[in-house]
Regions:
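A short alpha-helical cap/connector motif
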Residues: 1-126, 133-154, 158-212
C-alpha cells in the first residue's frame, strides 16, 4: 500500500527508467504470483548504496531475487550472500541471476536465517533485511557480530503502508504482532543507543542506520 500522496506516487513512477529484461520479468512474475518484492525505489536506493560502497552484502530474504539483482548489478569486487528459506523461490532466483549475468556475485544460502546466519563468516559491510517481519530484530541481533564497524543496516517495510501509525486495535492490513515488532525496531533505529539511523518514507518505509 502506498504511503505517499497518490499524485506523488504517480510522479515517481513516471520517473522510473526502462528496466532490464530480467528485472521486468521479475516484476511481472511477482505481480502474477503474489510474491513480495521491494518497491522499485527501494531497489534503486540499494543499488546506489552498492555502487558507492561496493560492499560485501548480507541479505535476509531473497524471494525471487529482485532486491538482490538491484544490488548485484552494481558490484565490482563486492558480493551478496542472500538467505532464503523457500527452496523453490531460491531456485527461481538462481535462474534470474544466471540470465542477468550476476551469478558469480551472488551466493544463495537456503534455510531458516535464524539458523544459517551462525555459519556465515563475514565480515559484512551492508545488512539488508526483508523477511518475516516478527523476526526482524532476531535477524539483526544474530547478524550484528558479523558486521564491520560502521556497517550499514537497511530494513524494509518499517512503515507497513502507514499502519504503524494506526491506533492500537484499529483495523489494519498487517497483523498486530508485525506492527508491534516494527514499532519497537523503529524506536531502536531512530532513538539512539546501538544504532544511528532514521526511517524514510521510501517504498513501504525503509530504516537506514549504522552501528555506533
Amino acid at each position: 500500500m502506498p504511503i505517499l500522496d497518490p499524485n506523488v506516487e504517480r510522479y515517481l513512477k513516471d520517473l522510473r527508467p526502462e528496466r532490464s529484461p530480467a528485472m521486468a520479468e521479475m516484476e511481472a512474475v511477482a505481480e502474477r504470483d503474489g510474491v513480495p518484492i521491494v518497491h522499485w525505489e527501494t531497489g534503486r536506493l540499494l543499488a546506489a548504496i552498492c555502487r558507492a560502497m561496493d560492499p560485501v552484502v548480507l541479505e535476509v530474504g531473497t524471494a525471487i531475487g529482485y532486491s538482490t539483482l538491484h544490488m548485484a548489478e552494481q558490484l565490482e569486487r563486492g558480493r551478496v550472500v542472500t538467505l532464503e528459506r523457500d527452496a523453490d523461490r531460491a531456485e527461481q532466483a538462481r535462474g534470474y541471476f544466471q540470465r542477468a549475468g550476476v551469478a558469480d556475485r551472488v551466493e544463495i544460502v537456503e534455510g531458516d536465517a535464524r539458523e544459517t546466519i551462525a555459519a556465515l563468516e563475514g565480515p559484512f559491510d551492508l545488512l539488508f533485511v526483508d523477511a518475516t517481519k516478527t523476526e526482524y530484530r532476531e535477524y539483526i541481533e544474530l547478524a550484528e557480530p558479523k558486521l564491520r564497524d560502521r556497517a550499514l543496516l537497511v530494513v524494509d517495510n518499517l512503515l507497513m503502508g502507514g499502519d504503524v501509525a494506526a491506533p492500537r486495535g484499529a483495523e489494519t492490513r498487517w497483523a498486530e504482532d508485525s506492527l508491534a515488532s516494527a514499532r519497537v525496531l523503529n524506536s531502536e533505529l531512530v532513538g539512539g543507543g546501538r544504532w544511528l539511523g532514521c526511517v524514510l518514507a521510501v517504498g513501504d518505509g525503509i530504516g537506514v542506520a549504522t552501528k555506533v
